[in-house]
Every structure is written in C-alpha cells, then in structure tokens.
Amino acid sequence: MATELSALPANHPRVTFGKVGVLLVNLGTPDGTDYWPMRRYLAEFLSDKRVIEWSRLYWYPILYGIVLNKRPQKVGKAYEEIWNHERNESYLRTYTRSQGELMAAALKDFPNVVVDWAMRYGQPSIASRIDALKEQGCEKILLFPLYPQYAASTTATVNDKAFEHLMKLRWQPAIRTVPPYHDDPAYIEGLAASVKNHLATLDWEPEMLITSFHGIPQSYFKKGDPYYCHCQKTARLLREALGRTEKNFMITFQSRFGPEEWLQPYTDKTVEKLASEGIKRIAVMNPGFVSDCLETLEEIAGEAGEIFLHNGGEKFTHIPCLNDSTEGMNVLEKVVRRELQGWV
C-alpha cells in the first residue's frame, strides 16, 4: 500500500494514494428469482433512458402499470432455470466475480494495480466500487464495460453511471474508459479457439454455425449507434478465422422486446426456418456476451434449441461464452494491459 509518509508533514493523517484501479463492469443481475428482487432489478434496468428511449410520459405508465406487475414472475421463472443454486446467484455474477479475481492475479506484476468488479444494474453497484477503489488509494481508474461491441444501451450507460457518481465527488479520480474491442485480434482468436474446442467434443459436424448477438431496435441504429456494424465485423472476422463461408455461417439477433422492429434476422425465426428447410444440425454461439447469462443459457441453449428440434432439426449445440476460461481471460487481460499503458 502506497503511503509515502516521508513526502508529507510529520503530523499529516495517514493516507493511501498512488494506486490504479481496474473496474470490470457487466450488465447486471437480480439478487434472487422471486417477485420483489426481480421487480427491483427490472425497474432499474427498464427505466434507463439508454435502454428504452421512448418518452417517459408514454413508457412509464406501461412499465409501472403493466410490465412490472406481470414480467417479474415470468423472468423469475426463467432465471430459476439457470440459477447457480450452489452460490444462490446468477451465473453472470459468478463469472464476473471470477473474471475480477483472475484479472487481479494476472496483473500481479503491477503491484500498484487494484482490480474490482461491478454491475450496471443491481449489486455491486458502480458507485460503491468506485468508492471502494478510492478508499484503497486509487487516483486513476480504468473503467472496463465488458461489451466487445459498443452500443449506447450497454457501454454508454455504464460510462454514464460512472460519471454520474463522479459528479457527486469532491475529489474525483482520473478515469479512462475502455473502447470497444470487437475487432481485436486476441478477441477473434479467443472466439475461434472456443468454437474449435467445443466442436471437437461433438461426434457430429454442424451444417450451420450461427453467431447470435443481442439485438437493439433498428431506430437506434438509424440514429447512429455503431453496434450493428461492430457485430457484422466481429462475425466476418470470426468466419474468416474459422475458414467458413456464408453458406455455413450466419449472423442473427435475439432478445427483442416491445413493438418496434429490431435488428434482423431474428435468431428464433432463423432456427425455425433452417429446420423447416431441412437443415438438421446447427451450432449457436453468442460472441457479444463475455459471460453466459439468461440470454445465452435460457434463451439460446434452452428456447432456441427447443424451437429447432421441434421443427425438424436433429442436432443442436450451444457453444459457451468465453466466461472465465483461459481463452477468455487472455482476451480481457490483453485489453486491460493495452489500456493501462502510461499509467503503470
């Protein structure tokens, strides 16, 4: 711990400084699967103007009058299906904690670096972890939204929340925000390795490999959000790295919500169409998620698989996210080391 008391007057209070913080931030998670934890989480998530850009006069009556009365039970049941019962938490929290611990171990050669993790929605909050890093002497903090592809509804809202807290601080730490890494060679190599490793465990070869990204409304893209372009580039680079063609590799978008048109093609409609067209074996992966969560474990490994098999498909496999694997941590570590340059 840096104290450098010799640089201070003899009667100066003991202070810590000279540290650099790294804060890994993912989307968030409810604290439990029953009604009230789910309602608190969904209220925070769906009231974010970056997520739902509709007029508050239009959206809030729908949110508080309909959505938050009906959706907590439905979403809670879905979380219950993929809950980490051993730790009594979501796997997103389990993996993000592990990523933070492994990152701290990987950066031991920088004794002045402190690693922590937070969630944009739910706990631990971004504000609480910024305060914790400051208390440990961090005068500089690298803020790492764990999203390879930039979107206003993901990366930007993490940055918003961090700076919202900084507005309340008398003494602000210096902040760097990690840029998108959708085309980083280490990221593409990690994804390609995860595909090869997973397919090597199968006794069959998929006819089609689908990269399913979380969708956003088309209106967001038309307003200038680069997310769609980032997803397309990631998919193209991964396809090239795997030596596949557009005949056996495709990109889709999932998790649409509400009446708007979202980015297409839709994942659920696509797997249904492939099965009806006679495709018997497919593999689906989620390159935009650094950790498995509700959208990958329940929506893809569960629901999408059921749709495909119900409509005539015979073999379905979900390729896990990079999570806290060696390949996954290699990607995150390389990004962090690059972005820390000049600070350590």
Swiss-Prot record:
Recorded GO MF terms: ferrochelatase activity; metal ion binding
Stored InterPro entries: Ferrochelatase, Ferrochelatase_AS, Ferrochelatase_C, Ferrochelatase_N
Catalytic activity entry: heme b + 2 H(+) = protoporphyrin IX + Fe(2+)
GO biological process, one term: heme biosynthetic process
Pfam families referenced in this protein's UniProt entry, alphabetically: Ferrochelatase (PF00762)
Family matches, as SUPFAM superfamilies: Chelatase (SSF53800)
Positions contributing to Fe cation binding: H214, E295
Localization per record: Cytoplasm
Metabolic or biological pathway, per its Swiss-Prot or TrEMBL entry: Porphyrin-containing compound metabolism; protoheme biosynthesis; protoheme from protoporphyrin-IX: step 1/1
GO cellular component terms, A-Z: cytoplasm
EC number(s) given by UniProt: 4.98.1.1
Keywords carried by this UniProt record: Cytoplasm, Heme biosynthesis, Iron, Lyase, Metal-binding, Porphyrin biosynthesis
PANTHER family tied to this protein: FERROCHELATASE, FERROCHELATASE, MITOCHONDRIAL
Family annotation (NCBIfam families): hemH
UniProt xrefs under HAMAP family: Ferrochelatase
Family (UniProt): Belongs to the ferrochelatase family.
Function: Catalyzes the ferrous insertion into protoporphyrin IX.
Name the UniProt record assigns to this protein: Ferrochelatase
Organism: Agrobacterium fabrum (strain C58 / ATCC 33970) (Agrobacterium tumefaciens (strain C58))
Gene encoding the protein: hemH
